[in-house]
Regions:
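N-terminal, polar/charged subdomain of small-to-medium soluble alpha/beta proteins
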Residues: 1-91, 98-152
Length: 152
């Protein structure tokens, strides 16, 4: 869409929802928050350390956002992802999707989160409460210094 907006951000700062400016053609806004659970592999954790291959992660996030705009006719997609340590109960991912109709907004949000988990090189390592041992190496999951990647 010619007037669509795509915003992607990797940050070590706590996530906040952007302002609520809504396009007059939008009929639906879906906000998704990915929250760090208090357990991993059945054990209590203090939180998760996220790391990323920054340049590749930025590239993949931009690509996913652009694909979502085209595939679901979105007016807006915002993807903010944390890196660094994220405590249990804090958000590691914020995504806002805006479209003319709710069905597209929900589908786009689900699709974009699934694509992010499959394609974006962001890795997690749980910090366990009892023994502070890292999770199994190589486990790949999601939900990233504040750095606005793109907006346009």
């Amino acid at each position: 869409m010619a007037n669509s907006v795509c915003e992607v951000l990797l940050t070590e700062a706590r996530l906040k929802a952007p302002r609520d400016d809504v396009d007059v053609v939008a009929g639906a806004v879906v906000d998704f928050w990915g929250i760090v659970r208090g357990s991993e592999e059945g054990r209590e954790i203090d939180g998760i350390e996220y790391e990323a291959h920054r340049e590749m992660a930025e590239h993949q996030l931009r690509g996913i956002a652009q694909q979502a705009i085209e595939k679901f006719a979105l007016q807006l997609i915002v993807i903010h992802h944390r890196i660094g340590f994220v405590a249990a109960g804090q958000s590691s991912l914020f995504m806002r999707v805006m479209s003319q109709h709710r069905a597209e907004a929900f589908r786009a949000s689900q699709w974009a989160v699934d694509e992010l988990k499959k394609k974006v090189p962001i890795w997690k390592r749980a910090k366990f409460k009892i023994d502070n041992q890292p999770a199994r190496e190589g486990k790949r999951d999601r939900p990233a210094e504040t750095h606005l990647i793109s907006r346009g």
